[in-house]
Amino acid sequence: MGWNHRVMKHKDGEDDFFQIHEVYYDKNGKVDGYTANGTTAGGNSLDELRSELQRMIDSLDKDVLIYEE
């Protein structure tokens, strides 16, 4: 089990938009859930914030997931 940041594609009528979500995985590595809303970056120090932002940037290199309500 674990989690990471992933880009998710949303539908807004006929338009698509993309947000970064926290995605959670089961013990087999399959998606088990994700945050209802896109996530924001934060941290208790600039280094933590930098690390969080880097994980978000890294998510741009992974396959885009489809957001389903």
Question: Where do the language-model regions lie?
Answer:
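Short N-terminal "domain-start" leader segments
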Residues: 1-28
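A short, exposed loop/beta-hairpin motif centered on an aromatic-Gly-Thr core
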Residues: 32-45
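Low-complexity intrinsically disordered segments
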Residues: 2, 46-69
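Generic, ordered loop/turn and secondary-structure boundary motif
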Residues: 25, 32-35, 66
